[in-house]
Amino acid sequence: MKPSIAEMLHRGRMLWIILLSTIALGWTTPIPLIEDSEEIDEPCFDPCYCEVKESLFHIHCDSKGFTNISQITEFWSRPFKLYLQRNSMRKLYTNSFLHLNNAVSINLGNNALQDIQTGAFNGLKILKRLYLHENKLDVFRNDTFLGLESLEYLQADYNVIKRIESGAFRNLSKLRVLILNDNLIPMLPTNLFKAVSLTHLDLRGNRLKVLFYRGMLDHIGRSLMELQLEENPWNCTCEIVQLKSWLERIPYTALVGDITCETPFHFHGKDLREIRKTELCPLLSDSEVEASLGIPHSSSSKENAWPTKPSSMLSSVHFTASSVEYKSSNKQPKPTKQPRTPRPPSTSQALYPGPNQPPIAPYQTRPPIPIICPTGCTCNLHINDLGLTVNCKERGFNNISELLPRPLNAKKLYLSSNLIQKIYRSDFWNFSSLDLLHLGNNRISYVQDGAFINLPNLKSLFLNGNDIEKLTPGMFRGLQSLHYLYFEFNVIREIQPAAFSLMPNLKLLFLNNNLLRTLPTDAFAGTSLARLNLRKNYFLYLPVAGVLEHLNAIVQIDLNENPWDCTCDLVPFKQWIETISSVSVVGDVLCRSPENLTHRDVRTIELEVLCPEMLHVAPAGESPAQPGDSHLIGAPTSASPYEFSPPGGPVPLSVLILSLLVLFFSAVFVAAGLFAYVLRRRRKKLPFRSKRQEGVDLTGIQMQCHRLFEDGGGGGGGSGGGGRPTLSSPEKAPPVGHVYEYIPHPVTQMCNNPIYKPREEEEVAVSSAQEAGSAERGGPGTQPPGMGEALLGSEQFAETPKENHSNYRTLLEKEKEWALAVSSSQLNTIVTVNHHHPHHPAVGGVSGVVGGTGGDLAGFRHHEKNGGVVLFPPGGGCGSGSMLLDRERPQPAPCTVGFVDCLYGTVPKLKELHVHPPGMQYPDLQQDARLKETLLFSAGKGFTDHQTQKSDYLELRAKLQTKPDYLEVLEKTTYRF
């Protein structure tokens, strides 16, 4: 049965699917090359590690402790790469590599190599790469690289190479990349590169000052693609003009980085390509300079001349940079072929073509990245960091705001030689990535405060050749990363204090060729200036204090071409420049005046000649002043053996602070002395009071007045109890001038109050009692004067028991209350009892002992002191002074206070007795002072009631812990009938 048409179509589809699947599988499955399919039977060398990579045999023998190449005994028939870095090979001997003749790359880095003998590389005819970096090689001789005819890449950076002989590379005809950075090469010999055709040359970090055209630059030619000359101390004088002219003839992208001038000082830090030839060599014209140096005249044809492009490219220390050019035009930019970074360079066989062939793919630049460039400007993109160099020089811009569209990630912006007059804060809103801004040779006269606040990464700022007159701190706000600042060739007349304090990283400041006459205080405070150019201004002298003393890190300072006035004002400045290194001062510091010192260097003039008005010689042995000493002011200090008085001027801040400190400490000491003196005088004025005198003064609650003695008559003696007379008188009066002599006692004021005066009925009772007493007593001769009054006074208690019973009961209650109040107080009442001879009456006294009958109080006797009355129980316990002194007899019951009508009363004589005690009127008191005794009216000693119960005793003990108010106790102890 024949298959149907549908089946045939189905089978055909299946065949096509199988066929297409087979083809697709064949395309996707890699077919190994013949050489890869071959088994590599090359042995490895123990202890090394071997691998196959990119069809090459890699032998890793790094860090194995080899000291000689002869220790590697294995032979490899295939091309291989040998890694021998970080071993201990101090020397390469002749024919060391004969058995390694198939090596295409040898790495001998970091081996501390010190010498390479002649013929050490014999046998390495196919070697293309040789690494000698990080060793201790100091010379390349003419025969050092013999046997390396195929060498294309030589890396010898980070050695100590000081000398290269002119024929060192004569056999390296295929050499293309030469890396010699970070060595000590001071110069390159003539015809060194005559036999080579270098495309990459790295001479960074050496000691080159100049490169000559003849025999050096003319052999490099147009084959050079990348040249690095940074970090060399270039001497920008007439000799370097040939290098500048040669750089103008090579592709502007060939030079990576800047050629920064080191000397002379006025060109320090500037790019060589930014300096005119007439400035480098002002005595000759450009054509004369080129002719004298043998530089061929440049063609006037634009199509044959290399374009002159931006003056500066991206500066890189560890990486080379390739760049492409983009012009703001309608034409599509043509890519410039540039090599890749040679450190580490790519590895490839047949890497470099012939001299007339373009570079091959491994070194070609990738297609240009689309960039944004302002209209009318030229932009260069650096591939390594995608940074942009924007060249807008001589384009007629009037304002920075005209730069549209704004470029992205701009690193360098050149706006020199335009017509810009003012700079505003909004001008740099999209330039935060800038590290160089060139605004030189414009017409700038105004810079708004904070104009550069959007440039935090700026390292170099050029404002030279403008019309700026004043510098203020606000102009530099936001420039905390700035290192180089150029203000030369302006019309600056004023610099405000601390103008540069907002730039802590400032290393270089050029203020030369301005109109400055002085510098303000703290002009350089907060900076770390290493180089300062003050050349060609109008300085007569410079202050040290507050200005030059802040230049602690100064390396170079140019003070030339200023009209220095060599008088006394210049002495501190002279001392300062003598203390710093002589190398730091650039050029001469010549006097302009006075006439006798004209054209003489300040450093060579003696101080006596410079300032004849010096007053005295400073003490010998003082150390010289340092440049940072704060005491260097407008007069010489210990830096010289002389001192003088300055003619005038403001007082320096350091002297003012020191003076204020001296005044402050002096005031403190004077105040302390006055205080001590016043205390001492007060102690002398205060009287010395003994304890007995203090006892006499404590009369605050003494019972010193009684209504019965309003007359203040003399006291008398009596008999009662023991029948012994007892007299009492005040103690010795206070000394003259005593405080109590003019201060009345407060209790006297209270006794004058009418509420304490006796009532009329009491006065009637007193008068009747006096009459009755005089009838009962004997004749007047039986009693001493005043005793009658005392007896009459006691008779008031001698009424009928019926009449006085209630009064007596009230009296006992009041006595108990008063005793409790006195016992709880720490204030004691002192009563002094004086014993007098019986036949000596107490003249004018007020004390007495009365015995009498009648009533419950008839048996009490009373003692009076200064008008107060104290009642004693019968039996003479307290009745006489003799009883107080007789310690052999049994002690009587404790005395109690009977009744006190008032204190002091209203009797003027009693007041006078208190305020002016008549102690000095009784000489017998002085003789019998030893007989005086003091009764202390206090709880537990003199006046406790026998009837007080135990509970009352505990209460009294508790009250002893408090100190009642004086007036409160006084009120409690003042009673009336």
UniProtKB/Swiss-Prot annotation:
GO biological process terms, semicolon-separated: axonogenesis; gephyrin clustering involved in postsynaptic density assembly; neurotransmitter-gated ion channel clustering; positive regulation of synapse assembly; regulation of presynapse assembly; synaptic membrane adhesion; synaptic transmission, GABAergic; terminal button organization
SUPFAM superfamilies, A to Z: L domain-like
Compartments (UniProt record): Membrane
Transmembrane segments: 655-675
Tissue specificity: Expressed in the occipital lobe of the cerebral cortex of the brain. Expressed at higher levels in some astrocytic brain tumors such as astrocytomas, oligodendrogliomas, glioblastomas, gangliogliomas and primitive neuroectodermal tumors.
SMART domains membership: LRR_TYP (SM00369), LRRCT (SM00082)
Mapped LRR repeat ranges: 78-99, 102-123, 126-147, 150-171, 174-195, 197-218, 409-430, 433-454, 457-478, 481-502, 505-526, 528-549
Chain ranges of the LRRCT domain: 232-283, 562-613
Keywords: Glycoprotein, Leucine-rich repeat, Membrane, Repeat, Signal, Transmembrane, Transmembrane helix
Composition bias type Low complexity, residue spans: 765-775
Membrane association type: Single-pass type I membrane protein
Family named by the database record: Belongs to the SLITRK family.
Protein name: SLIT and NTRK-like protein 3
Species the sequence originates in: Homo sapiens (Human)
